[in-house]
């Protein structure tokens, strides 16, 4: 080909029939417009496996023993293109798994290793994840071999677990069941900063290190948890201890688990900073095409092995960094440490004096020894009084340390998987753990029709029946599979006292429903859901539509002893647009809050629309307010909300902040009132398109059927047993 013919001419060759990366987007033109993309980010069209593929079914054909054997072999099969430190990939695989699971935060349940999200931006290019692209590429032959029987999400976590086993740790167990996503997660808020490792003051409300912005758990943009050099890169182990306590607590870890995970993660492997970090090439997401998804090209020396640069700190923590032992605590507690600089210029702690034989050897030449090092987080385990007590106990009792760490590692790597019912595989521990939110199995042998009849005969109103069932189920969040109606925790602390659950109304309703459950043999959890179903069926009948709401019995009733009150505090709703309620005013708009809750519940924009329209006319608003109840037939499941929202004989006038009057255009008479959220369904072009469908004369039955389908989806969101 003539070289001159390939030179750019200055004109774009694309005919602009479709938009890929050029041109302005709607967001560019209208940056404040409501963005519904987070509700459709994992559409089945992006999944190459197809909508009929079941990962749980595929897992049944996985040869787990062969897979584990292959992973054990991989650990010591050093590759020339990316050689293993000391001939063992254990440290690299553990860091990969740690950084996958460690992005989890309890506040909204997002992050974590449950979706294989480390394969995509931004996580694949975070500064804290330098070289993990190599770890995943080392795993590719195994992923290729086992294909769709093994997700990337499971493989990444299993590789870290097998790495520990290969170095001598008796692990607590492992569960398969994590399903891959196929594009970046748009719903996860990682922070507002526009540059990596920006000063942490941008995400703190004050000098108090506990004021870290919710829902974040990492102290800086691009880090998994704390800065290894100290707060904002300034060494101060006591201040770093404060950061650790906050970040690990937001990962659901207590002090003992924090010490165990930090020490256990640093018992093996090393940091890498033998070079100039400023010379590293682009991260994977912005690297040139010939890099094929790899990043951070290192031009120093061989660019690998002893010349590897990741965090910028350099050195191993222990004398024997490829074996599980108590060397970390012996090294940390039995030496005095001073602050020094790594070859890359990073601040790290090194021993004032140390015996030559206690130094770790070079990763390539065992005749060369170097000083061990400690991060600021490691030093925090020595200088913080509470961390120090725990460290000293671990140093005296290797067996106890190993047990605590193994359990903490299992918790770290499984916390975002949800209840034990989602676990698959031969190594699932038999023990039920409190953080798994255990729910005893429920009965299915009772008379469902009898329960429904008793509910229908009760004094409870349609709004009470529906609102109680909704409040029980709405806590579900698909981010970490927690919450939901199963277990009937709405009758226990802390949920029974949550303001959003209207405790007085709830207590009154529960007295009736609990008596019905006791008399019929049904669980309270099933009875609550059936109560909502009965309310909907009665409301549909009042609207002239006969419908039976699908129901699957089998929910159990959990107990106070099986409920970690503090752990459930993060599930407390502080807003619920479906019931037109805000606990207080927030800086974020009500419609954005609504989208966040909807996404966590796993609902689409269409499902959100039909549910809001139905719940409004059923009179389920918090406190019985009439905002958005655009009907003269409250309690009947009609499409009146949409009919009147889209009727041009009305005009909408603000009369207070975020509150509006709906007036007759001719007479000026106030017909109804509405919140800002109610009106969004008529003002946003996408939501209005859905609203118009349900407002049509031929959509009365469609509206009821779609409402019922969305309702059942919410009620069954946590019924993982039904997936079997």
UniProtKB/Swiss-Prot annotation:
What does the record list as GO biological process? cellular response to hydrogen peroxide; hydrogen peroxide catabolic process
Q: What class of enzyme is it?
A: oxidoreductase
Q: Cite the residue spans of the region called Disordered.
A: 1-26
Which UniProt keywords are given for this protein, alphabetically ordered? Heme, Hydrogen peroxide, Iron, Metal-binding, Oxidoreductase, Peroxidase
- Catalytic function, reaction form: H2O2 + AH2 = A + 2 H2O; 2 H2O2 = O2 + 2 H2O
PTM annotation, UniProt: Formation of the three residue Trp-Tyr-Met cross-link is important for the catalase, but not the peroxidase activity of the enzyme.
UniProt-listed Gene3D superfamilies: 1.10.520.10, Peroxidase, domain 2
Site feature Transition state stabilizer, where: 95
Asked if the Swiss-Prot or TrEMBL record annotates the protein with the keyword Iron, the reply is yes
Q: Which residues form the active site?
A: 99 (proton acceptor)
Q: Which PROSITE patterns match?
A: PEROXIDASE_2 (PS00436), PEROXIDASE_4 (PS50873)
Free-text remark on how the cofactor is bound: Binds 1 heme b (iron(II)-protoporphyrin IX) group per dimer.
Required cofactor names = heme b
Q: Where is this cross-link: Tryptophyl-tyrosyl-methioninium (Trp-Tyr) (with M-251)?
A: 98-225
EC identifiers of the protein: 1.11.1.21
Annotated heme b binding lies at: 266
Cross-referenced Pfam families, in alphabetical order?
Answer: peroxidase (PF00141)
Per the record, its GO cellular-component terms are: cytosol
GO molecular function list: catalase activity; heme binding; metal ion binding
Q: Where is this cross-link: Tryptophyl-tyrosyl-methioninium (Tyr-Met) (with W-98)?
A: 225-251
Q: Which SUPFAM superfamilies match?
A: Heme-dependent peroxidases (SSF48113)
Q: Which HAMAP family match?
A: Catal_peroxid
Family recorded in the similarity comment: Belongs to the peroxidase family. Peroxidase/catalase subfamily.
- So what does this one do? Bifunctional enzyme with both catalase and broad-spectrum peroxidase activity.
Q: How does it assemble?
A: Homodimer or homotetramer.
Q: What protein name is recorded for this chain?
A: Catalase-peroxidase
């Amino acid at each position: 080909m003539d070289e001159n013919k390939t030179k750019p001419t200055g004109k774009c060759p694309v005919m602009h029939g479709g938009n890929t990366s050029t041109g302005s987007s709607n967001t560019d033109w209208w940056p404040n417009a409501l963005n519904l993309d987070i509700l459709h980010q994992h559409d089945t069209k992006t999944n190459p496996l197809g909508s009929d593929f079941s990962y749980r079914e595929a897992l049944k054909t996985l040869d787990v023993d062969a897979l584990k054997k292959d992973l054990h072999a991989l650990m010591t099969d050093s590759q020339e293109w990316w050689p293993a430190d000391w001939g063992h990939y254990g440290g690299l695989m553990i860091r990969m798994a740690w950084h996958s699971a460690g992005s989890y935060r309890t506040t909204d349940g997002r992050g974590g290793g449950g979706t294989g999200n480390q394969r995509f931006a931004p996580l694949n290019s975070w500064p804290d994840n330098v070289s993990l692209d190599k770890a995943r590429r080392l795993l590719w032959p195994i992923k290729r071999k086992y294909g769709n029987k093994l997700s990337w999400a499971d493989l990444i976590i299993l590789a870290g677990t097998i790495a520990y086993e290969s170095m001598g740790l008796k692990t607590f167990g492992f569960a398969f069941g994590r399903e891959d996503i196929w594009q970046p997660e748009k719903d996860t808020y990682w922070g507002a900063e526009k540059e990596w490792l920006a000063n942490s003051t941008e995400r703190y409300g004050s000098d108090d290190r506990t004021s870290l912005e919710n829902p974040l758990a990492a102290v800086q943009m691009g880090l998994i948890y704390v800065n290894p050099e100290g707060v904002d890169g300034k060494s101060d182990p006591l201040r770093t201890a404060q950061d650790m306590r906050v970040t690990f607590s937001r990962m659901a870890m207590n002090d003992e688990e924090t010490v165990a995970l930090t020490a256990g993660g640093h018992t093996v492997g090393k940091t890498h900073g033998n070079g100039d970090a400023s010379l590293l090439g682009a991260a994977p997401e912005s690297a040139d095409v010939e890099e094929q998804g790899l990043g951070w090209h290192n031009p120093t020396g061989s660019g690998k092995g002893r010349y590897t640069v990741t965090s910028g700190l350099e050195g191993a923590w222990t004398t024997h960094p490829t074996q599980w032992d108590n060397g970390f605590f012996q090294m940390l507690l039995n030496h005095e440490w001073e602050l020094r600089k790594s070859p890359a210029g990073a601040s790290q702690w090194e021993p004032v004096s140390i015996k030559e034989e206690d130094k770790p050897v070079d990763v390539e030449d065992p005749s060369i020894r170097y000083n061990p090092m400690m991060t600021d987080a490691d030093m925090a385990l020595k200088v913080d009084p509470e961390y120090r007590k725990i460290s000293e106990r671990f140093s005296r009792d290797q067996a106890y340390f190993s047990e605590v760490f193994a359990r903490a590692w299992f918790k770290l790597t499984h916390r975002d998987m949800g209840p034990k019912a989602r676990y698959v595989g031969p190594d699932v521990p038999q023990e039920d753990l409190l953080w798994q939110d255990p729910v005893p199995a429920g009965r299915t042998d009772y008379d469902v029709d009898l329960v429904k009849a008793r509910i229908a005969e009760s004094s409870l109103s349609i709004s009470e029946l529906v609102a109680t069932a909704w409040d029980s189920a709405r806590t579900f969040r698909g981010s970490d599979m927690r919450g939901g109606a199963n277990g009937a925790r709405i009758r226990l602390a802390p949920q029974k006292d949550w303001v959003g659950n209207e405790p007085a109304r709830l207590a009154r309703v529960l007295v009736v429903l609990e008596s019905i459950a006791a008399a019929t043999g049904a669980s309270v959890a099933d009875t609550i859901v059936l109560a909502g179903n009965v309310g909907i069926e009665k409301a549909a009948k009042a609207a002239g539509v006969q419908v039976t709401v699908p129901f699957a019995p089998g929910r159990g009733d959990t107990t106070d002893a099986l409920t970690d009150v503090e752990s459930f505090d993060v599930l407390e709703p502080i807003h619920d647009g479906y019931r037109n309620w805000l606990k207080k005013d927030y800086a974020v708009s009500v419609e954005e809050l609504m989208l966040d809750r909807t996404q966590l519940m796993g609902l689409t924009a269409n499902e959100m629309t039909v549910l809001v329209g139905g719940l409004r006319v059923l009179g389920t608003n918090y406190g019985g307010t009439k905002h958005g109840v655009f009907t003269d037939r409250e309690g009947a499941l009609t499409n009146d909300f949409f009919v009147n929202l889209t009727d041009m004989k009305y005009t909408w006038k603000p009369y207070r902040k975020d509150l509006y009057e709906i007036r007759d255009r001719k007479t000026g008479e106030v017909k109804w009132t509405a919140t800002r959220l109610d009106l969004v369904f008529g003002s946003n072009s996408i939501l209005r398109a859905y609203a118009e469908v349900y407002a049509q004369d031929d959509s009365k039955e469609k509206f009821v059927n779609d409402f019922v389908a969305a309702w059942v989806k919410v009620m069954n969101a946590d019924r993982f047993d039904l997936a079997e």
